[in-house]
Amino acid sequence: MKQIKWGILGTGSIAKAFAEALKETDGELLAVASANGQRAIDFCNSYGGTAIEGHMNLISMPGIDAIYIATPHTSHFEFASACLKQKKAVLCEKPMTINATETMALIDLSRKNKTLLMEAFMYKIHPQTQKIFEIVNKRMKGPLSIKAEFCFSVDVPDTHRLVNRDLGGGSILDIGCYPMSISRHAIGALYDRNFVNPIKIQGEGELNNQDIDLNASAELIFEDGSVAKIRSATNLSSESDVTISDGEMTIYVNQPWHCGEFTGRESQIKIVNANDEEELIDIKTDKGIYALEIDHFTEAFFNEELESTLLPHNDSHGNTIALDQWRKELKVVYNDDRGEKRKVSVISKNDSRDTLLSTKIPGLDKNLSRIVFGCDNQSDTNHAFAMFDHFHSNGKMCSIQLIFTIMVRVITT
């Protein structure tokens, strides 16, 4: 396989796992960045590469093909945007961003700059997961009943990223994205689709003193009548397993997320039929789960693809939309969910706007663009501001709300 020259943003445990996995691939680690220069030095002493102080300094370095983003959730959008604008391919840790608006904007940047963007959901690449979806597709009928959990218990200070509001803490974003993802994919597998989004989400949970979810549960309702009950927690332990049933047969997976990574790269899928007869399917890989993810990304990179076939852009966007809805059930809100509180704008100013056809409306002293933007489908101020800014940055200046205001003005004068 051809070689990608990598940069890594972040020096935490997941960055270390990625750097270790790189040794199993043909990739080369060129540089590692941290806000703390000494941490970058310590990291590179163990895994190689050049230590860089400051994430943006690494992003602007020449000679790097792709960048793995392993920083806290609230920084994903800013760093991924900067990478894509410099045409550096991006493998971004899950969740791709804090909310669906940011994910939407990254996808747009990926397409505009013709640069690969992929969410790092390592479990989705693994043969075990693909086998699960194959069984669902070939041997099950809807509707399905799904139970999926990812829970653990840790005692961390309020400043830790898992529970810190300013760092995008909370169980839903950190690990709830897994049961949400596998539920959507299992339903999709029934219909030869990559995923199906739920039509209704009902959720509840426990919040900390920063109004961030320590644990959360949700019931997902799908159009075909399938139901998924999912749970995530950072203050409760569970088996963190997955079951998928159609009433006739049931799939049991006891290592759905790490797929045997910590048990000799061996895992097992159990199937029980209506007669309580068991079938065991053994899964074994020569490479670790993160190395498989890197190889998949590398193949997409050298095929000059903009997105992964197993983790396409619309999948990442759909999962983030569902996570947004789950958080809203618990009233978990981050500053980056509010357009008026964002520190980094979702849409960059476009200084080279094209001149569009315009028209004159009585009562106004300037022309308006002939293209009108509808204002009735924005989910929140964050989404609204992003859509309006994008509309205006492309040289368009007229909205339904503006037209309504003009009509009132004309009628009343």
Put a short name on every predicted segment.
Residues 123-201, 208:
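Predominantly a Rossmann-like dinucleotide-binding segment in NAD(P)-dependent oxidoreductases
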Residues 66, 72-73, 77-121:
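Beta-strand-loop-alpha-helix segment that lines the small-molecule cofactor/substrate pocket
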Residues 341-413:
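N-terminal binding-site loop/beta-alpha segment at the start of enzyme catalytic domains
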Residues 53, 92, 117-119, 253, ...:
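Hydrophobic residues in well-ordered beta-strands that form the structural core
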Residues 208-213, 222-295, 305-314:
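NAD(P)-dinucleotide binding in Rossmann-like oxidoreductases
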Residues 49-55:
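Conserved SAM-binding strand-loop segment of SAM-dependent methyltransferases
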Residues 66-68, 296-355:
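C-terminal helix-rich "cap/oligomerization" subdomain common to oxidoreductases
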Residues 1-47:
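N-terminal Rossmann-like dinucleotide-binding module
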